[in-house]
């Protein structure tokens, strides 16, 4: 805003001219009152400028968070910047396979509604109800310990897909309640906000459209998203650079909405698209598991740069070794008992995973639990 322009003709008096039919008359009018009015204008302009400057600074600060751009990954010091400093130009290669140059990857920074997917919309509306109307069961002062956010793997805790009950997943519900429902004997209270098939852009849209409302209070938010960002084998899969940037964008959105709240970033669960036994790696060929390892390594490094982020490594939960499959890394595989389709956990897989989550929550919440837990 420019300061008020004061006339250069600022002498002690000014001339007002009247032009009736009679001869022209010149009247000398003192300017003292006009000067006082201009001084008042100056004060008003200065005050307005200071107000707008302060307001702009406050609004700008709201969108500044601690982060690091893709180009700056690997630095040991925190960098103050904006999420807008994430640039698509930082992505060196969009496709998973190095020899593939064309793949249909969505913009990892752009929130996206799954238009035309009626059941997805209904599932989102159901999540809004859960997020806004979650009520403590024992005490009006008790807040949630953990809120799980993600895709079908997260939604599986509820035994549903797109909010619809799935019979073969009901054993998962029993596992969840035994660990994350204090009324059912669980050590902590948890809430699940996941939707099957979601990519990072879909979860970002959900978060920006009400799934983390102000009234939703939780000591910890637990994030698992990104495996669907790779796309399915044979569909020109997207690279780990694309996947990591999408997850990073969500993390920064959550840090903005919940500053000083602990956010646990769950590493991507292992998945197999190599062999019938659930093998993870293949000689002379880049697999999705290779990309998952790269994404998880970057997520861990990113979390180490932020005080309110914790990285959770899931690799040891679902992976076993069979020397008959090969040596070293080629002996690793996902047993069917833990992941029937080598992507989604079985009830046993959820049990093992959930018990490790409980251990992590104990570490995070140690000393923070109050009388409300009694």
Map each language-model feature to its residues:
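N-terminal secretory targeting modules
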Residues: 3-149, 153-174, 364-374
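Conserved SGNH/GDSL esterase-like catalytic core that processes O-acyl groups on lipids
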Residues: 102-252, 256, 272, 277, ...
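A structural motif corresponding to the C-terminal end of an alpha-helix
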Residues: 185-187, 253-263, 298-312
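Residue-level recognition of beta-strand->loop/alpha-helix junctions
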Residues: 192-194, 267, 313
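Secondary-structure boundary/capping residues
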Residues: 212, 230, 263, 308-311, ...
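Alpha/beta-hydrolase-fold catalytic nucleophile elbow
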Residues: 224, 264-267
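Catalytic His-Asp segment of secreted/periplasmic serine-dependent ester chemistry enzymes
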Residues: 270-374
């Amino acid at each position: 805003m420019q300061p008020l322009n004061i006339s250069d003709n600022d002498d002690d008096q000014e001339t007002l001219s009247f032009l009736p039919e009679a001869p022209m008359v010149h009247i000398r009018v003192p300017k003292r009152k006009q000067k006082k009015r201009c001084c008042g204008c100056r004060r008003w302009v200065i005050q307005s400028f200071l107000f707008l400057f302060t307001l702009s600074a406050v609004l700008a600060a709201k969108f500044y968070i601690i982060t690091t751009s893709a180009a700056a990954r690997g630095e040991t010091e925190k960098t103050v910047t904006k999420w807008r400093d994430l640039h698509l130009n930082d992505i060196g290669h969009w496709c998973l396979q190095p020899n593939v140059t064309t793949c249909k990857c969505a913009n990892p920074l752009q929130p996206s509604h799954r238009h035309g997917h009626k059941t997805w919309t209904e599932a989102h509306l159901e999540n809004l109800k859960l997020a806004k109307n979650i009520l403590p069961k024992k005490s009006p002062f008790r807040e949630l310990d953990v809120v799980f956010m993600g895709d079908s793997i997260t939604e599986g805790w509820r035994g549903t897909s797109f909010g619809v009950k799935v019979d073969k997943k009901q054993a998962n519900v029993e596992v969840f309640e035994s660990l994350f429902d204090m009324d059912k004997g669980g050590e902590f209270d948890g809430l699940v906000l996941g939707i099957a098939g979601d990519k990072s852009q879909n979860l970002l849209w959900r978060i920006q459209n009400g799934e983390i409302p102000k009234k939703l209070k939780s000591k910890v938010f637990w994030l698992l998203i990104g495996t669907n960002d790779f796309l399915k084998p044979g569909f020109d899969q997207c690279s780990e650079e694309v996947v990591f940037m999408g997850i990073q964008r969500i993390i920064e959105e959550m840090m903005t909405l919940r500053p000083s709240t602990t956010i646990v970033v769950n590493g991507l669960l292992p998945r197999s698209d190599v062999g019938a036994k659930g093998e993870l790696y293949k000689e002379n060929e880049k697999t999705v598991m290779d990309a998952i390892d790269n994404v998880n390594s970057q997520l861990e490094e990113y979390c180490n740069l932020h005080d309110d982020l914790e990285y959770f490594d899931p690799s040891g939960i679902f992976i076993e070794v069979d020397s008959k499959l090969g040596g070293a890394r080629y002996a690793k595989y996902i047993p069917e008992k833990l992941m029937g389709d080598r992507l989604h956990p079985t009830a046993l897989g959820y049990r093992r995973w959930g018990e490790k989550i409980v251990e992590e929550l104990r570490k995070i919440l140690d000393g923070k639990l109050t009388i409300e837990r009694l």
